[in-house]
Every structure is written in C-alpha cells, then in structure tokens.
Regions:
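Contiguous, small/hydrophobic- and glycine-enriched helical/loop subdomains that border
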Residues: 74
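N-terminal segment of the canonical double-stranded RNA-binding domain
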Residues: 1-71, 82-85, 89, 93-140
Length: 140
C-alpha cells in the first residue's frame, strides 16, 4: 500500500509533496524503494519562478537515509524545468538513475534495475552506440 499523499503549499510558495497521488516516476521510485525496505517516501519541494520572463520550476527531492543500511546515504536531486508536474517527474527519474548507479548489485533482477546506469561520456558506452550509425549510412 502506498503512503498517503501529502500535498501542501508553505507560506513562501513552495509545494511540498511525496507525489504519490498520481501514476508516474514518483510512484515507481517509491514502489522500488519500498522493495528495498525504505519506510519513508521521497519528499519533493517545488517552487515556480520567472527567469528573464520565462516561467520556470525548481524541484528539490530527497530520498531519505535508509532505515537500517547506514552505508546507503540520502540521495538529493535538484532539477529545473518549466512546470511543477513535469519537473517532479524529471526529479524522480533522475533519482532512479542515481539509485541504480549507487546500488548496481542490489538492483539486479529488480524492475528498477532495467533503467540505464550508463554515462554517455563513457567511451565504452559510446562504442555501444556509434556502431549502430552504420545502418543508416549504408542504406543510401
């Protein structure tokens, strides 16, 4: 059972939520964390603002310290977007990537482990991507 959703605005105009009231990456992240025995869902702090006339949104999200695995430190994500809902989704997806990178052995065999943990700046990753380009070049 999912933790109850908590959504509220503070006096400074920040939205605080665990984002469990809709389907998407926040719920997938929480369901995955629960399978690793986390007891508290990630918390999202979102604020909208104007930047040179462009509507922006900043979301700070924290996966709390694991309740009994002290070596699993909290994960903090800071994402900037344009709308609160989309930026919360982006923050949750970024947290999934970070969690998978920090705990590669633990996520093997878990649905969350299907998310890529690669770095496009890594030469080995580039070797996997570049050879596919020959298919387009040879089709002329």
């Amino acid at each position: 059972m999912a933790a109850p959703s908590n959504v509220f605005w503070d006096p400074a105009g920040h939205l605080h939520t665990n984002a469990l009231h809709w389907e998407g990456f926040p719920r997938l992240l929480w369901e995955s964390l629960r399978s690793f025995l986390y007891t508290e869902p990630p918390q999202y702090d979102a604020v909208e603002y104007q930047d040179e006339g462009v509507r922006r949104c900043r979301v700070r999200m924290t996966i709390p310290q694991h309740p009994f695995r002290s070596q699993w430190q909290p994960i903090e994500v800071d994402v900037v977007g344009h709308r609160i809902v989309d930026t919360i989704e982006g923050a949750a997806l970024e947290a999934i990537y970070l969690f998978c990178n920090q705990h590669p052995r633990e996520v093997v065999g878990q649905p969350i482990g299907l998310f890529s943990t690669t770095d496009p700046n890594d030469p080995e990753w580039n070797l996997r991507v570049v050879p596919e380009g020959h298919r387009l070049e040879d089709s002329t």
